[in-house]
Amino acid sequence: MAIAAVDANDRVHQLILLTERLTDLIAKQAVAFETHRPHQAAQYVEETSKLANLYRHESMRVRANVGLVESARLELRQRLMRATEAFDAVLARQSRAVEAAKIVTEGLVHAIAQEVASQRAAPATTYGAGGMVNDRPQHGAAITLNRKA
């Protein structure tokens, strides 16, 4: 999918709309992560993915052929630059929010793994027939932590 523009002004206007919509979606995802509600970000994934691919494709086209936009009105090009700056800022914000969520998740997994390991290492005693203390048989079970998950 590509932008079908009649001239440079139309192309820049469409790029502005694309950039602003993508910025809005990514900002909503960032808010979801910042408020510890990553499940709410999921509703934007499909549209964000489609628009991000279109944005990437159109950015490459413009970089390869600046003539596609250089004859557009100055105020439109300036508006596109501002929209792109806002987009970059939101991407940085989302990156920080996702990294924070990742750190929290990794911490939880690590804490759970430590608790499981400590439970398994605790003396295992039970009461058997006649009220005698029996050593509980140790059952081997593995837990794997992948630091690159």
From Swiss-Prot:
> In terms of domain of life, where is this protein from?
Bacteria
Per the record, the major location class is: other
Q: Where in the cell is it found?
A: Bacterial flagellum basal body
| Keywords in alphabetical order | Bacterial flagellum
Kindly state one GO CC term assigned in the UniProt record: bacterial-type flagellum basal body
Assembly state and interactors? The basal body constitutes a major portion of the flagellar organelle and consists of five rings (E,L,P,S, and M) mounted on a central rod.
Protein's name in the database: Flagellar basal-body protein FlbY
Where does this protein come from, organism-wise? Answer: Caulobacter vibrioides (strain ATCC 19089 / CIP 103742 / CB 15) (Caulobacter crescentus)
Gene name tied to this protein = flbY
